[in-house]
Amino acid sequence: MSKKWLSVMVLAMFMLTLGLAGCGGDKQQGKKVLKIGTDPGFAPFEFQDEKSKEYVGFDIDLIKALGTKMGYEVQIQNMNFDGLIPALEAGNIDATVAGMTIKEERAKKVLFSKPYYQSGLIVAVKNDNNTIKSVKDLEGKRIAVQIGTTGADAAKKIPNAVVREFNNAPEAFMELKAGGADAVINDKPVTAYYLKQGGDKDAKMVGDVLQAEEYGIAMNKKSTELKTKMDKALDEMKASGEYDKLYEKWFGKKQ
């Protein structure tokens, strides 16, 4: 065999190897992937485990279970809460599960799944604060909130209040602990979890729930097919008892 033909055969084998490798990559890329945006500073719904560094929580377990039912591989992407809806609108993610309250203003921009959790806002203050007993006592006070949330919306409606916005709930509670805020307005289950994890040494909840809320999984306005699949999978989880098991894992039995 001439050197010329040998060179041609080597080149052909090399190109074939590249082609096969390319096919493998296409197959990998062809997997049905569901890109989920979340803000992992909202325990017990989504947060980063200190040991494993994995994202865990009720929302994370829920979306993974829903993804399995729909035949998707779920990929979690960490982003700030106020960047979730813009990311959906831009098509950078497929859905977001982040303890997001279903409200009219948001529903103009995104599609929501059926409600998957009932929540509400609550006020938290330092243990030695006996002057703030409800939201009515917050006029003119310094209030720490998470940016872009319904808690922030509620705080901004309080006359003369100084609203301090933070990227996540833990930062808001740290501001309260440090004395930079007189109160925190946040979702009750998140506040209750914070207190349960040791925050009760410094803080307490006061007053009644400010307003009832429902969480939904948000999707791009054009993702009508995904919404249909998501709602169906959620119904199946509730009917089978799988949803209740996840609920009890993170919140205990329903009262």
Model-flagged regions — what are they?
Residues 30-99:
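Extracytoplasmic small-molecule ligand-binding "clamshell" domains
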Residues 60-69, 147-149, 216-254:
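Extended ligand-binding regions for polar small-molecule ligands
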Residues 68, 73-137, 209:
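Acidic, polar ligand-binding/catalytic clefts
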